[in-house]
Amino acid sequence: FRPSSPPAFDSPVFLAALAEVRQISDTRTPEQDANAKFWDMPPGTVTPPGYWNQAAAQLAVKYHLSEREAAHVLALMNMVGFDAIIASHEAKFTYWMVRPSQADPGIQVAIGLPNFPSYPSNHSTISAGMAAILGAMFPTERARLDALAEEAGRSRILGGIHYSFDNSAGLKLGRTIAAWALEHDVNGHEAFTLR
């Protein structure tokens, strides 16, 4: 599942992404700050997987899932969440991409700076993967869930700790893992659609 390599430090893509983070850092609005802090979810809080489990539980109630159906959704979604963090960290420690504030010390972060490499974004990978499972199970909710995953990823750029290419690679990686899981779901090799 490893994503392709991030852009080189001296490439136009890298420099543009770094400039975007610096521009946000220099002009961060209260709304951007609030968004970054909402999605921060550091250890000791609900965390991104906890957020998506809460969303799944709410959907299970909303659509009156049986215990078996709810268990299936939660199991498949959490399997994807675990695989997402493993795949994301495998890539992080393959590529060793520096954080924006390491590349430009003038960048002020709005949230905690994780002590591991930047590429790809864990939040993006986890959120895209878990949202994709929920979107497959609840197709009428797919657009809303995808938008939340995009927002979770974008929040890390707003917080000053990720580049846009970290986000896009994480979103793609999470969706790829979810697609693989849905294809190989033990329930007849395809996920059931609930609502």
Located regions from the model:
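Acidic/polar surface patches and capping/hinge elements
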Residues: F1-R195
